[in-house]
Amino acid sequence: PAVNIIASPWSAPAWMKKTGHLCQGGHLRFGEWTGNGFDPMHDSFEGCYARYFVKYVEEMGKLGIPIWGVTVQNEPSNAPKWPAMMWTLKQQAEFAHNFLRPAMNEKFPEMRIFINDDSTHNLMWPVRDIVTPDEASSVDGLTVHTYEGPYSNFFNASRSYPQWMFGMTERRCMINETPEDAAHIMSGIIGNWLVRNGENFIV
């Protein structure tokens, strides 16, 4: 197909979260067991959640909708009134390396995995200081929204792991903006940088 689809979750099921609720953020039950055994890939909450991603890709494929890539979390610093879940960049990288990539490799080894998928304020520190080279090897790229934080954070992030793909996955016209303002950011500032650096997607 001419369009590559990236899937991005808002929240794990409530029973997998420390809060027990879908909405207003909350964290995955990191380091805990579901009670069915002690196999990390099948009995930890992280392993169980990773297999939800695989099942989603399978079911979408049955509907004729091929999933090209996934992000670990949509807006992981956001805790709105609707379903959401909080992650640090480090937690995303660890989950991708230890659970999501191994789970995907069983059935979808070509699946692209992206981290961040949030505004650039999450990228104030060098990504290499947060994500280890081993973790980076399980990640295909980093995606951003352009609501908060300087755009230079995004540009600088590409220096840590230049082999990654970089893209923008969300932007809307803010209350104090015109459509032309938003277009300038998407196609002008971010879009031009992506093209100059050989990147190929704005979603």
Q: How should each PLM-predicted stretch be described?
A:
Residues A2-N4, L63-G69, F108-R112, S137-D140, ...:
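Loop/turn elements at helix/coil->beta-strand transitions in domains of secreted/extracellular proteins
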Residues P1-T132, Y147:
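Substrate-binding cleft and catalytic face of glycoside hydrolase catalytic domains
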Residues G141-V203:
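Catalytic-core region of carbohydrate-active enzymes that cleave or remodel glycosidic bonds
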